[in-house]
C-alpha cells in the first residue's frame, strides 16, 4: 500500500522512523523522523536545526491539510481539506459532548486518521492532558482510566467491545469517566447496550468521514434513548438526502447522504479521482434518512447495498441483527455475486470461545436472521473465521476476507 500511495498521490519525500526503514523500497528521498543511530539517511532534527536561508512571509497563508482515507477498498486516497478560518463545525462536538478545558483524556482513535487527528487538535486547544498508547490493549486502557482518573475516552466501537470483554464486571474503577466519544465506524445498538451497561450511559456519537469531516453529533442521552441514530446535523454543516437523480427525498425515505461545510474536502491529491457532487454538496458515500425528530439514521454504505431477487438489502442491518446472537463474537455481512439472483448476502462470523460459540452453526445463523428480517436478507453463505481483518480504525477490510470455513 505504501508504494501505491506514493505512486498515486505524487509523494516526493517520505518521513519514517528508523525502525521501519527496512520496509521502505522507494525511489524518492527518505528522511528519518526518529533516529536511534542505525541509519545514515538524513535526519529530521538536523534539517530543523540547519534550515536554508529563506525569508518567510510575516503573515503566511494557511496551507491545505492532506489526510489519507482508511483504504478499506484499496490504496488509501490523499484527501485535501482546507484549514478552517473559524472552528464552527467543531463547536458541535464540545456542545454535544461534555468535553471541557483541562480534562484528562484517553485517546485510542488513530491519530493518522481524521477522528483522532481532529480530537488531538481539540484537546490541545482545550489544554487537555492526553494519555495514548502505541498499540491498543484493553487492560492497559482500563488501567490508564483507573490510574490517572481520566475524564473522557476518545475511541471507536470495536475498541469498546474489547474493553467490555476484558472487564464486564467492573474490576477496574472507571467511575471518573464523564463521557465516551465514538466515531470511525458504525455504532450499533448492541455495542451501545454493552458499553452503557459497563460504563454507564455516557456514550456519545459523532458521524462524519475523512472527506467531509463532521456531519452529525448525538448526546449521551440521545444515544441511550435511540441507539440507531447518527445524530443531528452539526453547526455549519449543510446536509441533504438525495435520490439517484440528485433530487431530495421525502423525510423518512432512504437516499444517499450529501453534505458540505467549511472543512469539507476540495479534492484528492490524485488528479484522476473525481468528487461526486450535486449543487455544491459532496456524497459521503452512505445511505440514510432523516426522521421526524431531525435525527439522521445511517443504514449502510451506498456501494454496499445489494439487490437480491429485485429486493434492496442493506448488509449493515444483517450485521446488527447478528451482533445480538449468542455465540457470535464478531460478524460482518456483505454482498457476493449470484448467477440466479444477481447478488446474495454472505456472512463472516467469529464464534465466541464458550459453549454457545462452539455450538454455532450456519443454519442457526440463518434461522436467527429469518426471525428478524425479510427472507431476502437471510445469508446464503456463512463463513466461520478466527478473526475479522480490520484496519487501524477498526473497520473491517472486505477485500481481505477469506473463507476459512464455509457452510
Q: Where would I find each of the regions flagged by the language model?
A:
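Conserved helix-loop-beta element of the AMP-binding
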Residues: 10-13, 26-42, 104-106, 151-155, ...
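AMP-binding/adenylate-forming catalytic core of the ANL superfamily
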Residues: 14, 145, 153, 261, ...
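ANL superfamily adenylate-forming
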Residues: 19-66, 75
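Conserved AMP-binding A3 loop
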Residues: 64-88
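Active-site loops of AMP-binding adenylate-forming
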Residues: 83, 197, 209-228, 243-245, ...
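Conserved AMP-binding/adenylation subdomain of ANL enzymes
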Residues: 87-104, 112-152, 166
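Gly/Ser/Thr-rich phosphate-binding loop
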Residues: 151-154, 165-226, 238
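Conserved ATP/PPi-binding loop(s) of AMP-dependent carboxylate-activating enzymes
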Residues: 232-236, 245-278, 311-313
Amino acid at each position: 500500500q505504501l508504494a501505491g500511495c506514493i505512486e498515486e498521490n505524487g509523494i516526493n519525500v517520505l518521513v519514517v522512523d528508523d525502525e521501519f526503514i527496512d520496509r521502505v523500497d522507494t525511489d524518492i528521498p527518505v528522511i528519518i523522523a526518529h533516529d536511534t543511530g542505525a541509519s545514515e539517511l538524513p535526519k529530521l532534527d538536523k534539517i530543523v536545526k540547519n534550515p536554508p536561508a529563506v525569508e518567510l512571509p510575516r503573515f503566511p497563508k494557511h496551507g491545505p491539510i492532506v489526510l489519507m482515507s482508511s483504504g478499506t477498498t484499496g490504496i488509501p486516497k490523499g484527501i485535501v481539506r482546507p484549514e478552517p478560518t473559524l472552528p464552527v463545525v467543531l463547536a458541535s462536538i464540545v456542545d454535544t459532548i461534555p468535553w471541557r478545558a483541562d480534562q484528562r483524556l484517553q485517546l485510542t482513535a488513530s491519530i493518522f486518521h481524521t477522528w483522532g487527528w481532529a480530537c488531538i487538535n481539540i484537546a490541545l486547544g482545550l489544554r487537555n492532558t492526553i494519555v495514548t498508547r502505541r498499540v491498543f490493549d484493553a487492560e492497559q486502557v482500563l488501567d490508564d482510566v483507573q490510574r490517572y482518573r481520566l475524564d473522557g475516552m476518545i475511541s471507536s466501537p470495536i475498541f469498546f467491545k474489547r474493553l467490555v470483554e476484558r472487564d464486564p464486571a467492573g474490576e477496574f474503577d472507571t467511575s471518573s469517566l464523564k463521557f465516551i466519544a465514538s466515531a470511525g465506524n458504525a455504532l450499533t445498538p448492541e455495542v451501545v447496550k454493552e458499553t452503557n451497561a459497563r460504563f454507564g450511559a455516557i456514550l456519545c456519537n459523532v458521524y462524519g468521514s475523512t472527506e467531509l469531516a463532521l456531519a452529525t453529533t448525538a448526546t449521551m442521552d440521545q444515544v441511550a434513548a435511540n441507539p440507531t441514530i447518527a445524530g443531528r446535523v452539526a453547526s455549519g454543516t449543510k446536509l441533504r438526502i438525495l435520490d439517484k437523480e440528485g433530487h431530495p427525498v421525502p423525510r423518512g425515505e432512504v437516499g444517499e447522504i450529501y453534505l458540505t461545510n467549511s472543512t469539507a474536502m476540495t479534492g484528492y491529491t490524485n488528479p484522476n479521482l473525481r468528487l461526486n457532487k450535486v449543487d455544491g454538496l459532496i456524497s459521503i458515500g452512505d445511505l440514510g434518512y432523516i426522521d421526524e425528530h431531525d435525527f439522521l439514521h445511517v443504514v449502510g454504505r451506498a456501494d454496499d447495498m445489494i439487490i437480491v431477487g429485485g429486493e434492496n438489502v442493506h448488509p449493515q442491518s444483517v450485521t446488527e441483527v447478528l451482533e445480538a446472537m449468542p455465540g457470535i463474537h464478531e460478524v460482518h455481512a456483505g454482498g457476493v455475486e449470484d448467477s440466479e439472483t444477481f447478488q446474495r448476502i454472505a456472512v463472516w462470523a467469529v464464534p465466541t470461545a464458550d459453549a454457545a460459540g462452539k455450538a454455532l452453526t450456519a443454519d442457526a445463523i440463518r434461522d436467527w436472521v429469518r426471525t428478524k428480517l425479510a427472507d431476502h436478507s437471510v445469508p446464503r453463505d456463512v463463513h466461520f473465521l478466527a478473526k475479522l481483518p480490520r484496519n487501524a480504525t477498526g473497520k473491517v477490510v472486505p477485500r481481505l476476507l477469506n473463507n476459512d470455513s464455509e457452510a
